[in-house]
Amino acid sequence: MPTARQQSGQRAEELAAEFLRAAGCEILYRNYRRRLGELDIVARADGELVVAEVRMRTSNAWGGAAASIDRRKQQRITRAANQLLQQRPDLAAMPVRFDVLVVSDPYGPSPSIEWIRHAFEAC
């Protein structure tokens, strides 16, 4: 049985995927897990491959949700994206963009989502 934190994270990822779909993105993968890391959402939008990390925080302490994606986490995301591109050569020709979606109050009456495009560069 998932913990309350895991359930909130899953809800945040569901909301983020719906948000991206509504914005015209084609969702290719959700929770793409490999040995080197995990990608929350992989989508195609306007000729780009969008690798989206979903974050949920109830407080802006320590810089908020987006600030929690440190260099080490960026490296894991980049490595997992590289694995995906090796397995899917049809996607390898597309420019890759790393975005962050910050979900606030996922169970509230009106959850909000902040979409930070080009949140970080591949490392």
Place the predicted regions along the sequence by residue.
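Short glycine/proline- and charge-enriched loop/turn segments
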Residues: 1, 57-61, 116-117
